Amino acid sequence: MARSGLSEPPGRVAATSTHPRPTLRPGDTTVSTTPQDDTATTPLWRPDPARAATTTIAAFQQWAARHHGAPAEPLAPLADDPDGSLAAARYAALHAWSVADLDRFWTAVTGWFDVRFTTPPRGVLADPAMPGARWFPGARLNYAEHALRHADTAPDAPAILHLDETTTDPRPLSWAELRRQVGSLAAELRRLGIRPGDRVSAYLPNIPEAVVALLASAAVGAVWTSCAPDFGARSVLDRFQQIEPAVLFAVDGYRYGGKDHDRTEVVAELRRELPGLRAVVHVPVLGTPAPDGALRWDDLTGHPVARPEFEQLPFDHPLWVLYSSGTTGLPKAIVQSQGGILVEHLKQAGLHLDLGPQDRFLWYTSTGWMMWNFLVAGLLTGSTVVTYDGSPGHPGTGALWSVAARSGATVLGTSAAYVIACRKAGLHPGRDLDLSAVRCIGTTGSPLPPDGFRWIYDEVKHDVWLASVSGGTDVCSCFVGGVPTLPVHLGEIQAPCLGADVQSWDAAGKPVIGQVGELVVTQPLPSMPTGFWNDPEGTRYRESYFETFPGVWRHGDWITVTPRGTVVIHGRSDSTLNRQGVRMGSADIYEVVERLPEIRESLVIGLEEPGGGYWMPLFVVLSEGARLDDALRGRIRTVLRDQLSPRHVPDEVIAVPGIPHTLTGKRIEVPVKRLLAGAALDQAVNPGSVDDLGTLRFFEQLARERAADRTG
């Protein structure tokens, strides 16, 4: 996977940060709103030193120390480092080097992972200013070429294992067959007139055909974009009409929750409303024949092409367009580059998840979520990617654990919400299934609460590395996440990722430790957007990330960087709770409230009222058979007061029939706040961005009733 003996190319000029690094000074206070117990300083898990020494990141550090000036310190024996503080200091030194000397660090990454520049770069970071940083000027390469190069060394090994709700055993697709299908499809795309810069769209589930189509698109230099087939026509058109695709790959339907879902009418509407389409390719998941005028998948991928032709492209050539949730307007069409994604995903998958040819990489996702794009990155490291098309909770809540067992997954990724659902269902996957192959469990989507950490170690596996991560569609990667050589502490993400100059800033732009602040990134990352589609002046891009702190990426999350270097995510800062001048994270409230067995899900909103008042209601979805009476309201208030603070106690607790989510499953807070403030539904939210628009009707009606009470 990696190569050694590479020396640093000449002419690199180190980039240094102009922003201060946060350090703990005498007099600093440590304040955390995340519940911790008295054993918080004792790790839940420590990697065995022998295991840590064999990780890719450990080998990378030693190699980078010899060739690129990285700090080198040997791993401490377990007995000499009971709390993991020495390991943390070792990683902190590596991280500090990675952000203080961006040129050397990213040169080391490209050397270690043998990135193949057909035209070498003239430098690393030509312009570090954000927005607009320019990486590896003059370089030419191809993402798909790197994703398929393991076909040379392991042609018969599985590149993809696929499962769905109807299969017991995974269906393999070998590296050689994956490369052949990509080559055949890429040749057909060229025959259709697709050239670099043309857009290729997909309305596909998480199936091998989607991976083939993405890689074929990248091979010819087209710009990929995708939506999951559970998106309705309006949601898809809000995205695809922005970029005007020339090709649409589309399924006839999908299977979820034990049911077939026909999408032929949706696909017909997409064809009518996307006038720039030159071709529609039919992928028959449900086995229906291709509609009139559509091309058949098998006809395009059946040619005996030995090796694809890879277009050699500038480093910043667009690879794909991802989309924001679009809850309050048209989704942002986020453009990321071939080279930027390649080097960032090699770093993230290869170093932070420690993926290699020995691994089977399963992350539960859909093609409408950035984690699908990141799942494909497993191919870059030679890992076998496991695709699963179906519900994680069918036929029972623990279905995803069964998929992991049947596929032999070594790295399993899921959402924090799924972990909590399994805990509430009383599952024991470690007892009931063979999960011996699983060495790492990743979680993302929302902060994983301490109870989720405990449940994984109690009920899944006591010796497993739990990599809670946080990043965003905006960079298709993680800002903070897992490190295989570090301990895991209750309720905390292990560390900032290499090359990511993550800090927590107060309102004055001062770095803080042990206090809640804004998540900022003070230096560029290669996978940051090259821009937004149809934003030629970059106005919307700047407004999205760089208005609060000019030249610094503000991500929109509240975080605490702890004195030991771990990170706690408190929720979105754009839905801030602010009582009596104290900022609070909604995630902390959800974690405490949803421990109660009577509460299935919750939503908290802070609303400034006329006359200077502040109203903070807590909305709860009750578990089956539960009743919101005075006793339960009292218990909710008591646990919030005792485990957080009196400020976290809501003004009212209100039962609701459901909580609204984005199409990728995240709670919607800002549109609910707008509704409660009196905005009309069509002004508060983009209807096509919500999983169940009916859940918002309750809040709309509540706002009317409150307005009537005030005027009455």
Q: Which residues does each PLM region occupy?
A:
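Structural core segment of the AMP-binding/adenylate-forming
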Residues: 3, 11-12, 21-25, 31, ...
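Conserved AMP-binding/adenylate-forming core of the ANL superfamily
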Residues: 94-97, 144, 160-215, 232-237, ...
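Conserved pre-ATP/AMP-binding loop-to-beta segment of ANL
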Residues: 156-158, 282, 293-323, 330, ...
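AMP-binding/adenylate-forming catalytic core of the ANL superfamily
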Residues: 202, 227-252, 267, 393, ...
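Adenylate-forming
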Residues: 205, 247-266, 287, 389-393, ...
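Conserved C-terminal "lid"/linker of ANL adenylate-forming enzymes
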Residues: 279, 603-609, 617-621, 637-712
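Conserved AMP-binding/adenylation subdomain of ANL enzymes
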Residues: 342-360, 370-411, 425-427
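Conserved AMP-binding/adenylate-forming
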Residues: 439-566, 572-576, 589
